[in-house]
């Protein structure tokens, strides 16, 4: 799991698309993008084998993370078993553990140890030595991607994320897609206008090339997909 690069302005987005088109050549015409809010929480990696959750870890340094399987099993949003027809034999699901703003306020009122913000509360709750303590904390999970999915059938990130939703894995209700930079900017403006009413903290948006084959061709530049 790698960290994401930053684009701060509309010109940054346009320059990003220009670099993509230069790299992809004729394949770079009409690039479609998927957009999701970046939740301010703790990034985790879940591994399912034959539909069963077998391990979970934090992002750590991008290569090695802290194993938190027992604590992850206490979070209601994360299914212990995915029991649907044609469930892949191996799935790597990436997402964010977080706490809503309202739940954070309630937790701080009832706790002797005050947390500075919802992100710290989520991280501290997830890293408890005793899973029973974690189980009492109001932690949530939303997936923001995937690694290996054996036998993957979908050609786009958007469609694969909708498949995760069918498997009862939570995804962002604000996920969207666009085939233009102007469309990305419009979606950004719309989400910013709603930000105060989003029940959890976000610290930006993530734009991804929607076509998974193009993603594979583009690979990674430094630490930025």
Regions found by a protein language model. Give the residues of each.
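RNA/tRNA-interacting regions in translation and RNA-turnover enzymes
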Residues: 1-225
């Amino acid at each position: 799991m790698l960290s994401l690069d930053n684009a701060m302005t509309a010109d940054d987005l346009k320059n990003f698309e220009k670099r993509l088109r230069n790299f992809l050549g004729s394949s770079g015409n009409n690039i479609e993008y998927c957009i999701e809010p970046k939740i301010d929480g703790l990034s985790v990696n879940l591994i399912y084998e034959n539909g069963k959750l077998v391990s979970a870890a934090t992002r750590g340094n991008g290569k090695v993370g802290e194993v938190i399987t027992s604590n992850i099993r206490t979070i209601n949003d994360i299914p212990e078993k995915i029991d649907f027809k044609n469930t892949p034999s191996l799935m790597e699901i990436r997402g964010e553990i977080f706490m809503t703003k309202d739940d954070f306020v309630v937790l701080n009122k009832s706790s002797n140890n005050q947390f500075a913000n919802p992100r710290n509360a989520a991280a501290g709750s997830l890293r408890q030595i005793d899973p029973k303590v974690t189980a009492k904390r109001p932690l949530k999970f939303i997936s923001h991607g995937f690694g290996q999915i054996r036998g993957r059938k979908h050609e786009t990130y958007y469609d694969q994320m909708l498949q995760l939703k069918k498997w009862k894995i939570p995804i962002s209700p604000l996920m969207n897609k666009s085939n233009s930079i102007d469309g990305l900017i419009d979606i950004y403006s719309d989400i910013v206008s709603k930000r105060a009413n989003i029940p959890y903290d976000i610290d930006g948006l993530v734009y991804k090339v929607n076509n998974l084959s193009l993603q594979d061709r583009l690979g990674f530049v430094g630490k930025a997909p």
